[in-house]
Structures are given as structure tokens and as C-alpha cells.
Amino acid sequence: MTTLDHVIATHQSEWVSFSEEPLFPTPLEGGTEEHFPGLSSSSERSESSSGENHVVDEGSQDLSHSEQDDSSEKMGLISEAASPPGSPVQPTPDLASAISNWVQFEDDTPWSSTSPPHKETALTLTMPCWTCPSFDSLRRCPLTSESSWTTHSEDTSSPSVAPSYTDLQLINTEEQASGRASGTDSTDNSSSLQEDEEVEMEAISWWAGSPAMNGHPAAPPVTTARFPSWVTFEDNEVGCPSPPVPSPKKPNTPSAATAAPDVPFNSTGSFKRDRPKSTLMNLPKVQKLDISSLNRPPSVIEAPPWRATNPFLNETLQDVQPSPINPFSAFFEEQERRSQNSSVSSTTGKSQRDSLIVVYQDAISFDDSGKSQPHPDAIEKLKQLQIDDPDPVGNTALPDDDPTASVELDAPSPASALSQPRDGWPMMLRIPEKKNIMSSRHWGPIYIKLTASGYLQLYYEQGLEKPFREFKLEICHEVSEPRLQNYDENGRIHSLRIDRVTYKEKKKYQPKPAVAHAAEREQVIKLGTTNYDDFRSFIHAVQDRLMDLPVLSMDLSTVGLNYLEEEITVDVRDEFSGTVGKGDNQILQHHVLTRIHILSFLSGLAECRLGLNDILIKGNEIVSRQDIMPTTTTKWIKLHECRFHGCVDEDVFNSSRVILFNPLDACRFELMRFRTVFAEKTLPFTLRTAASINGAEVEVQSWLRMSPGFSSNRDPLTQVPCENVMVRYPVPSEWVKNFRRDSVLGEKSLKAKVNRGASFGSAGASGSEPVMRVTLGTAKYEHAFNSIVWRINRLPDKNSASGHPHCFFCHLELGSDREVPSRFANYVNVEFSMPTTSASKAAVRSVSVEDKPDVRKWVNYSAHYSYKVEIEQKKSLKPDFEGEDLENPKECGVQ
């Protein structure tokens, strides 16, 4: 008859066979095996000790009766030590049944104890067992748990006879309450338990069954000769250090008594997911802390609780009313909910509060002071607030955003005089019209008229009936940029050209292949004048006439033209003109005109749509995603006095506020123009000018500084500079000779530069040399403007701070006071340009081309400023307008 120990040994030997393919896969280190975390290490130890177990099995069959009685007595010690002190005497369990108790480790509910209550009559150890033949053989195998891991997967039907989880809690509770002298013995081993997530039963049982470690002679000690064999077992484990083992309280209690409670403890500790229930691990022995303090409310005497301070709460402002602009009504609902939850949790769950809950309740306790003194009226008012549009309709601060408000534009505008129709302009004609190597070119005086039908008529003199030349303006004509050109010994002349421009598509191969649309210009006429006002008036008249030209029938020769690169370019240019008051630089009058030019290269007939940030279509835009253009402003404006090119469908614009047009092919034309209100509160820079005339002594001084209120100047990283700045000081014709001097090549205008003053006239004529100085740029008299022109290429300067002031100073001593005119100029003229900016905040929000989604689209912005600044009349000049006396008030501080 086959005995139970023989069957177990046979199955164990098969399970630990040295085959290449193990029965169960060994999990790697850090693996995710849940039910067999320690299977790898235990199987390796069982393989190394399988031969020894067979010898023990054969010797156990010849066990004498005396040895069985001896073993029964010793097993009684084990079961007697397994029961806690003061508890009812537990019977001695059958060791074979205790072995089969390990099978319950694989159940789905490892923490539930399904074992029946212990019987009063204990069975004696009459059946020999291969795992524990005698305590003599235990010297080679200190505990049954060392080899019992080899049979835990063979039989799963035996009931559990080991101490239950409740018994273990009673043992640990008494161990926590009593001070143990042997707690320091397991300090090193317990420190390694905190670093490992898996608790190995074999390692715990080995240390618990070692009487030499705790010094208890009840069980036979492990000899030093057998200690290296256990080290080899530890080397085979996959990084599982030995955890701590609680030591018994009484010195006469054998150390093997801890093996019985440690067996189920280790089996439950091997589950990673159940680690929060770690009260069985006796951590307080290592950390010298009372673990029961976690279950008690925090005591003020032991350690004051940490209180989280609110960095946004100022206790001095507790009586301040809440801000009425807070639109979040949900904030108050959250506050009420928190107050209710905190009051309930403070009364019911105070005893169950751990350290984290204490910190959380302290962190939200700063709201209690504000809730104790509420403001019912203000809170009710805040609860009724709604989130409004950031640009509300009817806001007086933003007149353009109100479509119903009637904004009165400044009238008459400063630029109205330039756009007024005139009979003609005295101009200079460049003769001959084309360059010739054999002849020189010169300027000849003529008189020009512009007819309503778009004809330019050239007369030799004003009043003649028949022009000597006449030509018609065409849609392909463009007016060139104004420039200054040498004229005579007095100075330069303002010149412009009217060109016939054609655009052609060209391929470029350097530096990389690309397609470009180059412009070819053919000069039609070149004109010039020394009167700057006539010059600007003529330019405006020609631009108005080009825009009003009728659109002729489409040229069929260009309809079928296919472009390699289809593109459309939109140029938005703002022209600001106005008058600025003295002192605080307040804008007294202004006029903003926006011009939109189109240049397109589209194959065939194409219908285009252009959408602006018009306040009347706010919220009603319907455009495709690929047609949306990026903008840098969220402002909505109102358009005034709109004028359109002949290719625009005005009926569609009046109904939908969308510009629908058929663009001219390869021709730059003005699509539309409109007036708006200036979008800024201040100009890019402030200029204050003061003049003093005392007898024959004249002084003029200006201070220039960048304005911090201008939107572009707020961020130095995104600041847009002012380019080609001109500040013109009108000079009477009687004073011109004082600003010129003789040279080898004729008369020259004196020029003042940075850190270098300019001397005017001769000492014999005026008695002393006048001085003109600047701290930035250059200053000299220019005959084309009849003014002293202070020129600055760029503001702010690259080598100076943005808020650094710049100064112009001029001191002139006349021969007598009779040279002082009866009327002196009251304004200085300022003119400059700003790229990539907009004075009106007009923005192109969408550009769409019908049935052409792959068209390249470009939008360019620029602004041109031209305004007048009043001159302050003073008895004496001082660099500081606040009245501080300086040692030398006539000179500027050099930067």
C-alpha cells in the first residue's frame, strides 16, 4: 500500500526534475506574476535539495517508536508555542495536515480562512513523513517550510489547520504592546524588507528556525558547517532579501514557536496587491515607532499638525467686498458644497483621520474666516453676473465696436486739402523723357491738368488752351514711390514717375528652383517739384483717378493663361494725418484712411472673396478653414465712407459685408478704401517743441521720447520701430542764408550730427556763430521742404533704451530784430512709416478663391504717419519743461 509520504515524495521528485522545460514558467525579476511570486526561488532550492529529500524519505520508513514519541513531544512544543499566551490551549496539529495547508495559497481568496475550528483531541504523529522524520534530520532541513514549497501545487483539497489570520493579529497586537529585547537582532534584515515588494516564505522560515540567531537552546542549533549550503540557496533567489522575523518575548520559549505563525504570514505577504494590510510585518520594531498612533487622532502635545497656508489670502483684506467683475457663479456653489462637506466630515470622521486627511483639511481651512462674515448683497449680485462679450456692443470706450453708434469723424480732415480737386499743378518735367548717352537731361517747368476722363494734359505755361502733350491713364499704370533727387545748387527736388507695369512669371534656379512674378516697368513720364504740398496733392489726385477707371472687357489672350504658381497678394496700408496739441501731446484732430491693393496671378476667371474685421459681421462669418488668414488683433472696427474699385460687387457688400470681386490679371490695383477711427490712444512717440525769440536771438528745442501707451512699445521683444522719421522745422526765407556756407563746389547746407554741432553763417555778419545740435540722427536745412529737417533712420535707436529721450537744439543770432518775421510758424511737421502695423486695426480675416484651394495667399500691413505738432512759445528755453534751472539751458545733453 502506497503511503501518503511516498506519494508526496514521488510527486515532488517529478516536479523538481532537472529537465530543460520546467513545469511552470519561472517569472523574471520585476515580473507581473500574481499567484506565484516566489515560485522561481523555491523551485530552484527544491531542485538542489531533491536528492536529499529522497534519502530522508527512505529513512523515515524505518523510524522507531521511540523516535516518533520524541518527535511528538517536540511537535507539541511547536503547537504550544503557536498559540498566543493567555489563549485556550490549542491541540497539536497533524504535521501532514499542516503541510497540505499550504495548498490554500493558490485560492482566489487568500485572506478568507476556510479551515474548520480546531478540535479538542489532537492527532498524534503516528504516520511517518518524509518532510520531518526526526529533529535530528531537521539539522539538515531546519523547518518543514523549506521543503514544503515543493508540494504546494500537488494537493489542494486538504483543509487548513494552521493558525488563522485573526490569531496572527492577536499575536502581533500583543507583540506590539510588549517591549522586545531581541528587536535589534532583526534590524538589518528588516531594512531589506522595505526595499522588496515580494516576501519570500523560505527566507523568513529559515531565519525564524535558527536558534543560534536568537540564542534559544530549545531546538538543535544550525551548525556552521551547514551554513554555506543555505547561502547557495540564497544565491539562487532572484533578488529576494531576507525579511525580519519577530522574536519571542520570553527567553524560555523556543524560537521554533515562531514558525507556525510565520507560515501563513509569509504566504499572504507574497501577494503584491495586498501589501496595504501590512500590520503583520512588525515595522515598529525597526523604526522604534508606535504603529497604533496611526489609528489615533493627532495629538497637539506630540507634534503640532502642519497647517497649509493660503498664499492668496491676505488677512488684512478680510473686510473687503468681493470684486463685482467676477463672472463665475459656480465658485459660490463650490464654496457652499465644501463648507457642508467639511462640517460633516469634521464631526463624523474625526477618529478615522490619518495624516493625509489632516493636511487636506488644514489646507482648505482658510475659507472658514471668509464664510463666517458673508456679504449677502454683493454675493447675490455676483451670482447674477453673466459672461459677456469681451467687446460689448455699446461700449463707449470702443466707438468702432458699436454698429449702432454714429461716430462723428473729424471734419474737415487735415488731408482733405490734399484731395480737393484742383485745376492743375505747376510741375517740372524731366527732359528728355528717356535717357540718352549723347545728351544730358534737365528739368523744365510745365503745367499739368488732370481731366475727369483720366487724361493728363501737359502745358508749357498756365493759361494755354492747347496742351503740347496728352496721354490717358490706364489700369496698368502705377505711381512710383516719392524720392528726393538733385536739382540745383540750392538743393534737391521731389520726383515721381508714372510707369506702365507688367508682371511676368519667371523661373529661378539659384539658390534653389523657384517661381517668381517679376515686374517690368516702362517709364511713361517723370515729374518733380520743390513744393511739397503740391507734390502730395498731385499724387493723391492721380491715385484717385486710377481707382475710378472703368473696368474694360476681359482680355481673352490672358484668360487661358496658366500660371505655374497661383497666388494673390493683399496690401493693407493705413495713412494717418492729424494735429497734436502742445504739452500733453493730445490728438486734437485725426484722419485715418485705409487703402487695400490687390495683385493676383490666377489662371482663368476666378471669383474672390475678402473678409475684414467688420463689426457688422461679427459672429456671422462663414468661411472655409483653408481661407482663414492669421491676424494679430481681436478688435472689430466700423468702416466709414467706403469706396470700391469697378470690379467689386457693391450690392453683395451692402447685403453681406463681404467684398466679392473679380481681380484684374497680373495688375496691381486699389480694391477699396475706407475711413476708420484711430485705434490707439497715443502716437508711437511724443514730441514737445518750444521756441523762444528775444530780440535778435532765436532758440528752438525739441524733446522726443517713445510713448509707453502705444501698443507696439509695451513689449520690447515685439516692438515695431518707426522708420525714416522726419521732424521738419519751418524756416523763414530771410533766415536761409544763415544755414548755408560757401565751399569749393558751391554753397552747402550745414549739417549737424551726433556729438558734433554745426556752425552757421559767418562771424562777421551775425557777430557770433549759431549752434545746432542733435543727440540722435542728423539735422540740416533742406530746400525741398524749406525747413530744418531732423532725420532719424530708426526709433527707438538700437544703441539706446526705449524710454531714453532725444533732443534737438538750435540757437540762432540774427543781425537785428528786424529780421524776425511778423508771423512765425506754429507747427512742426512729423512724418514716418511703420511696417507690419496698422493704425486702424483693420485686418484681413479671410481670402477665398473660387474652386482654387491651393492658391498661395499673402497679406502685408503698413502704416504711414504725417501730422503736425504745436510749438510752445516761451520767453526763455530750458531743457526741462518743469522749470528746473540748469547751468547751460541752451544745449542738449549728449547721449
Swiss-Prot record:
PROSITE patterns: MHD, SHD
Domain of life: Eukaryota
Every MHD domain range: 565-872
Feature: compositional bias, Pro residues: 241-251
Record PTM Phosphothreonine, positions in chain: 253
Residue stretches of biased makeup (Polar residues): 145-193
Listed GO CC annotations: clathrin-coated vesicle; cytosol; membrane; neuron projection; nucleolus; synaptic vesicle
Subcellular location: Cytoplasm; Membrane; Synapse, Synaptosome
UniProt PTM: Phosphorylated in vitro by PKD.
Listed GO biological process terms: chemical synaptic transmission; hematopoietic progenitor cell differentiation; regulation of endocytosis; synaptic vesicle endocytosis
Chain span(s) of sequence motif NPF 2: 326-328
Pfam families, per database record: Adap_comp_sub, Stonin2_N
Domain SHD positions: 424-557
Region feature (Disordered): 15-119, 145-222, 234-280, 386-421
Keyword Repeat attached: yes
InterPro entries per record: Adaptor_comp_med_subunit, AP2_Mu_C_sf, MHD, SHD_dom, STON2_MHD, Stonin, Stonin2_N
Residues where Phosphoserine is found: 278, 299, 759
CDD domains: AP_stonin-2_MHD
Function: Adapter protein involved in endocytic machinery. Involved in the synaptic vesicle recycling. May facilitate clathrin-coated vesicle uncoating.
Domain writeup: The Asn-Pro-Phe (NPF) motifs, which are found in proteins involved in the endocytic pathway, mediate the interaction with the EH domain of SYT1, SYT2, EPS15, EPS15R and ITSN1.
Assigned protein family: Belongs to the Stoned B family.
Name the UniProt record assigns to this protein: Stonin-2
Organism: Mus musculus
